[in-house]
Amino acid sequence: MTNDTVHADAVVTEEDLRLLRDLKVKDRLHDLEVAYCRGIDRRDPELLKSIFFDDAFVRLGDMKEGGVDEWVDWIINEFKPRFENTTHYLLNEWYKVDVKTAEGETHRLSYHRFGDPARELIAASRTFNRYEERDGVWRIAFREVIRDWIHERPVDQELFTGGFAMELSKPGPEDKSYEVLSMFGRGPLPSE
C-alpha cells in the first residue's frame, strides 16, 4: 500500500493533497490581497500592517520604498489624506506556490477622488509579491508595484444626485461597512 489515503471508493493521492494544500494557500493569498484593498480604502493602518511580515519591504517605484511601518505611516498620514475617497479593485491574480514560499502577480484598478473642483484619478497597476509562511501564518515578505496606465478627469457631480444618488463611501471608520457588517471591524487580520 502506498501513502495514499483510501475513503470508501475514493483514493486521495499525494498529488491530490498537494493540490488541495496549494488551493488553500492561494485562497489565503487572495485574502491578503483583498485585505490590502480594504485597508488602503478604509485607511486602516493595523489591517495594512497585518498583511505584511514586520521585516517586509515595499517598493512603489519613485513614490516610496522602505519597511512596512514606514510605508504604512507614509500611505496613511501623507499620501492618502490628499484624496477625499479611494477605491481599489483586485483584478487578475496569479500565484505560484512552493511549500512555504509563494510568488504572485496581481493586477489592480484604483480610483482616487480629490480637489476643488473635484477630479478623479483612475490608474491600473501590478504588484509583484513574495509571500512566506512563518509559524503557520502566510504574509507578504516583499512587494513591488508598477504602473500600467493612469488617467485624470473632472468629476461629473450630477452623477452623484438624482437617480444615481447613494450614500458615498468614506475613507475611515465612518464608512457604512462598519455599521452594516459586524464581522468586518477595523484592525489586523486574525491569525490563521
Feature map (PLM): residue ranges:
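Short, surface-exposed coil-to-beta transition loops
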Residues: 88-90, 122-127
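Transmembrane beta-barrel outer-membrane domains
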Residues: 27, 83-86, 120-122
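Short, surface-exposed loop/helix-turn segments at secondary-structure junctions
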Residues: 117-121, 157-159
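Short beta-strand edge/turn micro-motifs at domain boundaries
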Residues: 2-6, 103, 126-159, 163-164
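Short, low-complexity N-terminal intrinsically disordered segments enriched in polar/charged residues
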Residues: 1-38, 42, 46, 50
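Acidic/histidine-enriched, glycine/proline-rich intrinsically disordered or flexible terminal extensions
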Residues: 153-192
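A solvent-exposed, acidic/Ser-Thr-rich amphipathic alpha-helical stretch
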Residues: 45-114
